[in-house]
Amino acid sequence: MKKLLILNGVMGAGKSHFIKENKLEDFTLSSDELRIKMAGFDMSENGLVISQKKDRQVWSTLYTILETRMEMGLFTVVDAMHLRTRDFKKYKELADLYGYGIYVKRFDVTIDELLQRNAERESYNQISVDVIVKKFEVFTNQVLPDYVTVIN
């Protein structure tokens, strides 16, 4: 069966590190990389941050590229947080259409570890502490859809 791997975790949980460590860059679609390419950076009180201004276009583009890859039967990894159950809906539609299994790699990291990693990031890639805490709470309470297979 053809495989779609969805990475699932809060910012700083190790998703991008996992991609590099496993040499998956050529198979990966990253919402943050598309944000940088489309909208660049914004200035915040702490310096540069990845712009969220074109988020709708970012996701439209990501889904277009993903569908093209799935039409061709290619293994694909999607690097984004995927914190809400509804975040998986489009993947389900495409998986059903093209005969893919959906696999989810969860990055379950403590809040202390997330905050430490955030502090060590480049300034443009840092997130405010309150945002990390909120995203962590959402992740902790998340129920994944029953049509995905969780892998370790």
Task: Please provide the spans of the model-predicted regions.
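Glycine-rich phosphate-binding loop used to anchor ATP phosphates in small-molecule kinases
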Residues: 52-102
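Short, catalytically relevant binding-site loops at active-site mouths
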Residues: 11-13, 35-36, 83
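Short N-terminal micro-motifs specific to bacterial/archaeal maturation
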Residues: 1, 25, 49, 53, ...
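Conserved substrate/cofactor phosphate-moiety recognition/catalytic segment
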Residues: 16-74, 113-116
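Conserved GTP-binding G-domain of TRAFAC-class P-loop NTPases and closely related GTPase folds
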Residues: 1-8, 13-17, 21, 25-27, ...
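Short beta->alpha linker loops
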Residues: 33, 82-86, 109-110
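Charge-rich, low-complexity amphipathic helices
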Residues: 41, 84, 91-92, 113, ...
